[in-house]
From Swiss-Prot:
Compositionally biased tracts (Pro residues): 227-236
Function of the protein: Probable N6-methyltransferase that methylates adenosine residues of some mRNAs. N6-methyladenosine (m6A), which is present at internal sites of some mRNAs, may play a role in the efficiency of mRNA splicing, transport or translation.
Protein name per UniProt: Probable N(6)-adenosine-methyltransferase MT-A70-like
Keywords: Methyltransferase, Nucleus, RNA-binding, S-adenosyl-L-methionine, Transferase
Bias-annotated ranges (Low complexity): 103-114
Primary location class: nucleus
Region (Disordered) location: 64-114, 223-261, 669-706
Organism (species): Oryza sativa subsp. japonica (Rice)
Amino acid sequence: MEAQADAGGDDLAAMREQCRSLEEAIGFRRETQMGLVASLQRLVPDLVPSLDRSLRIIAAFNDRPFVPTPNPDGGHGKSPAALKPHHRRALPDPARSTRRKTSPGSSPASVAAAPGGLDAVRTMVAVCLLELVPFAEIDAAALARRLQAESSSASEAERTALADLAAELGGSAASAVVLALRRIAEDTGGVQIEEAMIGGKSMTMVWAIDRNKLLKELPESATLPLLQPPPAPQMPPSETDAGSAMIPRTPQQQQPQPDMWPHSMPPIFPRPRGMTMQGMQRVPGVPPGLMPLQRPFMGPAGVITMGGGVGPSPNQQKQKSEEDELKDLELLLNKKTYREKQNTKTGEELLDLIHRPTAKETAVAAKFKTKGGSQLKEYCTNLTKEDCRRQSGSFVACDKVHFRRIIAPHTDTNLGDCSFLDTCRHTKTCKYVHYELDQTPDIPPMMAGALAPPRQIRLQRAEYCSEVELGEAQWINCDIRNFRMDILGQFGVIMADPPWDIHMELPYGTMADDEMRTLNVPALQTDGLIFLWVTGRAMELGRECLELWGYKRVEEIIWVKTNQLQRIIRTGRTGHWLNHSKEHCLVGIKGNPLVNRNIDTDVIVAEVRETSRKPDEMYPMLERISPRTRKLELFARMHNAHAGWLSLGNQLNGVRLVDEGLRARYKAAYPDSEVQPPSPPRASAPIDGDQGTSQKPTVSDGERPA
């Protein structure tokens, strides 16, 4: 009966203590709210009357007496300063009501073993902050979410304690975490927190932590000095010493086997929190189900204690020098504030939004994609089918493109591959190894009947308009230096590959620099783009010519040259000092043309062919940039003739014109010249080159540059 009376007295005392704690919390909240009202009244003078009107309506609706709001200027004039973290009054501990007083008949170990309340939440917060390696600033709400996540290392008992504390505070788990952070900052200084009002909401940020001080929040740090090895029980003298007979001991005489791993070190086989090891002794102050020292104990200097010692040795305790403190201070001053981080984040989001393609740009880019997927076939890295079968260990080579070695009677395989491969000018006498495409099937025709037929690679063409819309290829054999450019009309795109005089032996004639400067290129364009191929010393001369012709250089395309085996060329006959593996194409703009931007890249990787022949990838790329416009190529040869292009050069086969307007003007200027075909096809619509613009007015899939 006396024990029951004592227990009832303890419960009554606990209830009184809880009531007093709640009253303190209510009073503190009221003071805080009055401080907020006082700070807001400076911005909104009629704040208190408006609050009183609302409270009066609520009181009348609930049949309760109305108490006017006191004037906040009377006693809360300095309330905003009280909201700062270092001036904030300590909150009452509502978790004290969950701690029962030790009864005379209970042991301290059993009382300390019950987890819960503020102490358990402080431990959870400390563990979560220590797990942030490296540490990054975090707010209380995010910290609460990490504690409540399933991946958290907190046990169910600790999560229950967090929920109970949040319920006692009358808020969410974030309020319990805020209370724990304040207590840690006030008691040990393990965290540096700052509270601010953002968007009308209170936010608590953890800016920095002290790991050495946070370790004191862990229960194993508090119980470590109490760990003492259990005294060895006094055993009676063994009867085996007296005689040679082995007498089994009784269960009362059997000594418990000690652990193989000392208690002052973390277990050699760590387990999840909540699991215990049989034979491990209970440690006072550690909740049941929680193993002591699951984390290695770290002393004040951050040194892990080894062996059975309690702390680091004196020679390990190194005090921070003045230079280290200055570095820490400088690092703290250079840290971005929360507002600076928010501004940086906002700026990054704006940049991402600005550089993101618009819906129109995305639709235009989708229009130029190849229908039916990519039409490219990959080259096998093993080069030949024999090497492919040998490397893969199969009887059949892969379905990629392979080559076949050409072994002539004069070929010496010990010399290796020819540097020029299919561009070699002495294939009949060259002793190096050459290659050709291996088109022979790797599977006999009898067996290939059951397999799917190989996909045929078709020639690349514009998928967004028909060949009839592009028109037929046209060309004029002439001397560009004295040809009448004014009869050609206006063009949207011009591409030129001039025979620059680069002071080298070339298989074709060259033009002097002054002849290039005086070309009548300005008569060909008022609004459009020009693509000028340059090499060697002609790079600077090409830029000068663009400026003289009225263009502004805006881009530069690089052609990376590859050989027959799709490898970068390392040897060649160009370059005074280094072997040239690339060529440059200057891009100039005149006027305000209608073009598609950000469709293609400025790098082309293509195989070299005849001398001075440029990659065919240029023609579809220029059609994508300026679709359905007239296009002209200067210094062209017969392999440059493409649909929709007019070619000029002195190595073309006569004159071929299908545009009736252009034929009429050419015959008027050069009546003695023969034009093919004798009568142009009626299906081709004439294009009036006398118009003042180089684009059709109906084109709507481009944009004018700013």
